[in-house]
Structure formats: C-alpha cells, structure tokens
C-alpha cells in the first residue's frame, strides 16, 4: 500500500478521503448506518484447479498443510490489493482508505458446540505469497487453540460480567469512541470488526454460503461466507455440460465505498485468481492480467 504523510482528520487506521463525489458523500449522511447500505452478491467459484494445485503441492511435500481456505484468503487479499476501493470504509460519516490489508475470521478452539470461539485478524503485507499465508494461518490457529485468549476476548469476558446498566454505559462510550476514531489500538488491532474483510468458512461444517450482515460498529466493509466445496454440473467452454469442483461465496458489501460496476470487476478478478492459484506464488502486489 502506498504510504502517505498523515494529515489533519486522518485516523490511526486510515487516511481520510477528501475527493469523494457528491453522491457517495450524501449516502454517508442519508445512510449513516453500514447495515442500511448492504448489497449482496452470490458467486459460484470453480475450484477444480485449486484441488489439483493442493494435490500437487502435497505430492511435492508430504508435510504441506496447504488448504483451500488458505488459497481463498490469499486470493481475496490479492484482490483487495489490486482493487483499492475495496479497502475503504465509512466511519463518523466520513470516508477513509485503510492503511493495511487485513482479513479476519473466528476460530473455534474445539470442533463441538460447547467450544469457545476466538478472534483472529491477519495483517497481510504486499510482498506476502501463498506459502507465507498458509504458514501464518496454520501457526496462528494452532497458537489460539493451544494458548490463552487474546486481548479482545479477555475484554469481552470482562464486559459480560458487568451489571447491565454499566454495560449500557460502556457500549454508549464505545460507540462515541468508534464514531470519532478514538478506539484504543490495543482493542481494534485484534477486533474482526476493524478488518478489511471478515470471513466465515461455513463449508468447514458442511453448510452452504448464506449472506451475513455487516456491523454498524467498527470499520469492516466486506463480509464473505464460504460454502462447502462440492461437485456440480456446469456449462463447459464448448457449451456442453461438465462436472467441476465448485464452491459458493456469499458476499455482503457496503455500497457506499464503491459502485456496482467496480464491485462486479472486482469479483471477476477474484474468480480469475481462484481459477489460477499459481498466481499466488508471486507476491500479492504483483499485477494480474485478466479480462475485466
């Protein structure tokens, strides 16, 4: 990401945008809540090449822990790096360009209903590749499952033990701090609601990909649910039906950060990367040629 000198009105986590067109600026006031400005995209991704790619990597190295989810994370991060408007957010009725690319998801400590959940936020550098991301996810998830709770989890546990009137006062204070961009970095750095993209890998529990709402709290502008990989009959290049490995993505976006044409081209880029996973062996900042 291009670094710029901090100016008056910038936040710790983003640079204020002062050249927003009148339509979008008006939307920030007419639709002040993120949940009022949600749009939804359901997209079917062909992951046949991803399945082959993982098999090839495991044949080369039996210790490889590469998973389809790791490739999805890398592909989404690469898309955000090359479609910068996706890394914008609206806070306090102003527009900002986020300083970093971060993807977040919830980690269940054990695979059962009673297990506690923890939050994981990955800050992804532009020179990162798929191998770096796979190692980081594998290591961070193991650390969460084996270790203690993070700062945000501990704060939430403390909050849950307070009397209701105190909880209401704290929540009101948090909303004020959030509006003016004054939330402590010790909290926001580990809070999934302050990430570029929030992911939910529903496929890991054998489910499809529903649409998930955004949150008015925080700065997250994109939510993606990932369904279960399955085989499906789809039209081939010559029009004849073929069986392919596919997965559904349920994408929810804040329409105030860009327009429909921009979102559509961004999804097309994401599909191209997913269908060509070898592109992720290069640093994420490396360009991609595709028909937009």
Predicted regions and their residues:
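C-terminal catalytic/motor cores of large multi-domain enzyme assemblies
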Residues: 1-292
């Amino acid at each position: 990401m291009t670094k710029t000198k901090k100016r008056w009105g910038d936040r710790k986590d983003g640079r204020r945008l002062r050249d927003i067109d009148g339509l979008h600026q008006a939307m920030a006031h007419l639709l002040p809540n993120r949940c009022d400005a949600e749009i939804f995209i359901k997209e079917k991704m062909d992951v046949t090449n991803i399945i082959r790619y993982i098999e090839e990597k495991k044949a080369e190295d039996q210790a490889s822990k590469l998973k389809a989810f790791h490739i999805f994370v890398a592909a989404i991060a690469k898309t955000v790096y090359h479609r910068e408007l996706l890394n914008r957010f609206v806070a306090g009725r102003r527009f900002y360009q986020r300083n970093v690319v971060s993807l977040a998801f919830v980690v269940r400590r054990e695979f059962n209903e009673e297990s506690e959940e923890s939050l994981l936020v990955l800050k992804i550098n532009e020179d990162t590749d798929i191998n770096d991301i796979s190692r980081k996810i594998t290591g961070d998830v193991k650390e969460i499952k084996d270790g203690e709770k993070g700062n945000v989890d501990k704060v939430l546990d403390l909050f849950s033990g307070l009397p209701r009137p105190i909880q209401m006062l704290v929540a009101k204070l948090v909303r004020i701090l959030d509006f003016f961009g004054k939330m402590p970095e010790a909290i926001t750095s580990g809070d999934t609601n302050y990430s570029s993209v929030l992911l939910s890998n529903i496929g890991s529990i054998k489910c499809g990909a529903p649409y998930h709402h955004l949150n008015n709290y925080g700065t997250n502008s994109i939510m993606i649910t990932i369904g279960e990989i399955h085989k499906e009959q789809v039209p081939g290049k010559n029009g004849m039906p073929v069986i392919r490995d596919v997965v559904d993505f349920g994408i929810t976006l804040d329409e105030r950060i860009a327009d429909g044409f921009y979102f559509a081209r961004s999804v097309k880029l994401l599909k191209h990367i997913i269908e060509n996973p070898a592109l992720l062996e290069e640093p994420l900042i490396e360009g991609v040629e595709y028909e937009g």
